[in-house]
Amino acid sequence: MDTDKRPIYPIQVWDITETEFDIKNNYRNETTFALSNGYIGTRGTFEEAYDFDIDTGLEGNFVNGFYESEKIRYGEANFGSPLLSQSLLNLPNLKETHVILADEKFDMMDGTVEEYERVLHMKEGILERKLIWTSPKGKKTRIQILRLVSFARKNIMLISY
């Protein structure tokens, strides 16, 4: 039994901050850093759309109203029991972005990462990722990515580099 009671993230009033990327915590962090406005929802996966193993990461993009229905079969009829089940569909990844810097594709799994930080600013509803990436050819680039799922315009998700 795990008796470690330390918090996973530093305790802050309105922010949740990840200070280093660790693939072992990626699946949990994709859930923690998710954004949603009740209409659009997206897991906190990276814009580079890594093809992680299913136990390491799972892309997730959802729009309210896109679901599949299936009949529920009961052994016997019960008054008030639902006739259909509904499952929200995981839609294609619309946030996948490939950034090319001096003929090299930005990839955190290739090259080295320094000063990594990912912050969910809950008061503003913004997910921010900052890091310094050194490419395999040795070029350093400071990268900042902001993501927002709008509450004012429910059908808009923004990504800024």
Residue ranges of each PLM-predicted region?
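Beta-sandwich/jelly-roll carbohydrate-recognition scaffolds of carbohydrate-active enzymes
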Residues: 2-160
